[in-house]
Amino acid sequence: MDESSGDGDLGNEGHGGEGPAPSHSHTVQASDSPITVPGWDEYFLGIATAVSARAKCMRRRVGAVLVHEHRIIATGYNGAAPGRPDCLEGACPRGRLGYAEVPAFSDYDVPGTPGFCIAIHAEVNALLFATRDTAGCTAYVTDQPCPGCRKALAAAGVVRAVWPGGQFDVDELVDWSR
């Protein structure tokens, strides 16, 4: 099921029971003051933002949340492999460079190059630590997934990726013209 058009609040009639749950925030009149309720996409992107606060990268802090039928099955953030020194501890060659020193269009996945990055991306960490099958999930990410993460998400059966300002459906995840 698409997280943006579910059946309400996990089985109860939290949105009034009339039609699909909204994917964008809406205002509900409660007593004397209106309450703004975020849509599912906004809600899970907000959680991904909170997850990104755990990232150990000096350059980019990215969070990801894998969701199946409005239930979180995994979270992940970018950083070194568990138990390994991370960027904040000075272990990342890319993290030791100033922004002007990072080679333009460098391959951050090639060890020994000046732009090499030790981080495992947030999406991959979420996939690695998922507690359930990821087929049919939506990935909520704080930044557009890179090509490698798009491939990993598609291979894991993720059917949709959402980030602030954009989204890919199952076919777009592996459409390299995008």
Task: Please tell me what each predicted stretch does.
Residues 1-178:
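Zinc-dependent deaminase catalytic domain
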